[in-house]
């Protein structure tokens, strides 16, 4: 299915012809298809706004979605979108030139949210939370303007797992990024088709394809300390017990509300025991109980 180089989307032209890369590519495609099917992301004839930051994850997402569409396996229109947030030194020509060369429909939007973030966040604090909120609001607006039904993000399995533990350790709740949700206004879906894909696979895929990666440290902000700490914890667990990340991720798909403590998820007040067999027999007539 994926070996004919004469019938391939330009985003995957020049892919390494090694057995290792073929296996990687097929695994990522399979996991993306599984996420799309499991969470019912496809509405035939829909239009998706595929968010492209220039990082390894969003390049992987864009390539795989276009590959699926190219193969007739994703019956939706795709519009790539990059939000240039005015960060100093951002290479503004990289993405539009790349997307044009690949023949990918796209929209490049400039919004100086960087100045807002710098004005609102004290020096020494992480900018990521406010930056993300401003970016999300602009992406929703663009999606509406472009007639899109969904905003598609490049969060992968490790992002989802890290967010779960951040909420557990620091937020006091069991929650993470779901693969599919509806925005607060109720008019747009938000999809994460890379939900089942490991970060390491995204990194290797983008590196092997030699996509022009744009780092996320141009504004001088580093990733939040809490996320870095969680990542280090998970890395340690994975090193001591390979496969631990995948086991924990599967647990997020196997919740049992009756074995947790949230009365909003399970009706503990209405919980009742079933009558014992001996008690049921007391209600029977004597001749049916063998006493006549």
From Swiss-Prot:
HAMAP family registered for this protein in UniProt: TtcA
Keywords noted in UniProt: 4Fe-4S, ATP-binding, Cytoplasm, Iron, Iron-sulfur, Magnesium, Metal-binding, Nucleotide-binding, RNA-binding, Transferase, tRNA processing, tRNA-binding
Biological role stated in the UniProt entry: Catalyzes the ATP-dependent 2-thiolation of cytidine in position 32 of tRNA, to form 2-thiocytidine (s(2)C32). The sulfur atoms are provided by the cysteine/cysteine desulfurase (IscS) system.
CC annotations in GO: cytoplasm
EC top class, as a word: transferase
PANTHER family linked: AMINOTRAN_5 DOMAIN-CONTAINING PROTEIN (PTHR43686:SF1), SULFURTRANSFERASE-RELATED (PTHR43686)
Gene: ttcA
Pathway in which this enzyme or protein is active: tRNA modification
Cofactor binding note of this UniProt entry: Binds 1 [4Fe-4S] cluster per subunit. The cluster is chelated by three Cys residues, the fourth Fe has a free coordination site that may bind a sulfur atom transferred from the persulfide of IscS.
Additional observations: The thiolation reaction likely consists of two steps: a first activation step by ATP to form an adenylated intermediate of the target base of tRNA, and a second nucleophilic substitution step of the sulfur (S) atom supplied by the hydrosulfide attached to the Fe-S cluster.
Assembly: Homodimer.
InterPro entries the UniProt entry points to: Rossmann-like_a/b/a_fold (IPR014729), TilS/TtcA_N (IPR011063), tRNA_Cyd_32_2_STrfase (IPR012089), tRNA_thiolation_TtcA_Ctu1 (IPR035107)
Binding-site list for [4Fe-4S] cluster: 128, 131, 219
Main location (coarse class): cytoplasm
UniProt-listed GO biological process terms: tRNA thio-modification
Record field: catalytic activity: cytidine(32) in tRNA + S-sulfanyl-L-cysteinyl-[cysteine desulfurase] + AH2 + ATP = 2-thiocytidine(32) in tRNA + L-cysteinyl-[cysteine desulfurase] + A + AMP + diphosphate + H(+)
GO molecular-function terms, A-Z: 4 iron, 4 sulfur cluster binding; ATP binding; magnesium ion binding; sulfurtransferase activity; tRNA binding
Entry EC no(s): 2.8.1.-
Chain ranges for the short sequence motif PP-loop motif as given in the UniProt record: 53-58
Cofactor: Mg(2+); [4Fe-4S] cluster
Protein's name in the database: tRNA-cytidine(32) 2-sulfurtransferase
Family under the similarity heading: Belongs to the TtcA family.
Cellular compartments annotated: Cytoplasm
Pfam families the UniProt entry points to: ATP_bind_3
Transmembrane intervals: none
Gene3D superfamilies: HUPs
């Amino acid at each position: 299915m994926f070996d004919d180089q004469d019938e391939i989307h330009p985003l995957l032209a020049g892919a390494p012809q090694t057995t290792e890369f073929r296996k990687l590519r097929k695994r990522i495609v399979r996991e993306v298809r599984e996420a799309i099917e499991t969470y019912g992301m496809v509405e035939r004839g829909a239009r998706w706004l595929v968010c492209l930051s220039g990082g390894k994850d969003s390049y992987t997402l864009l390539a795989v979605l276009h590959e699926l569409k190219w193969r007739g396996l994703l019956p939706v229109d795709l519009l790539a979108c990059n939000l240039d947030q005015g960060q100093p030194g951002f290479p503004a020509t990289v993405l539009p030139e790349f997307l044009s060369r690949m023949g990918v429909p796209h929209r490049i939007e400039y919004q100086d949210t960087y100045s807002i973030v710098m004005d609102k966040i004290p020096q020494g604090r992480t900018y990521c939370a406010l930056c993300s909120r401003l970016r999300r609001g602009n992406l929703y607006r663009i999606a509406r303007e472009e007639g899109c039904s969904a905003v598609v993000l490049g969060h992968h399995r490790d992002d989802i797992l890290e967010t779960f533990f951040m909420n557990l350790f620091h937020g006091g709740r069991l929650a993470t990024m779901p693969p599919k949700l509806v925005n607060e206004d109720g008019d747009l879906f938000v999809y994460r088709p890379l939900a089942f894909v490991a970060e390491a696979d995204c990194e290797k895929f983008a590196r092997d394809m030699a996509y022009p990666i744009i780092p996320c440290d141009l504004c001088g902000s580093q990733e939040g300390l809490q996320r870095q700490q969680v990542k280090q914890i998970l890395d340690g667990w994975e090193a001591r017990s390979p496969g631990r990340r995948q086991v924990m991720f599967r647990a997020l798909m196997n919740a049992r509300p009756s074995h947790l403590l949230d009365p909003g998820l399970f009706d503990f007040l209405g919980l009742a025991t079933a009558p014992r067999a001996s008690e049921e027999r007391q209600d029977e007539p004597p001749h049916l109980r063998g006493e006549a």
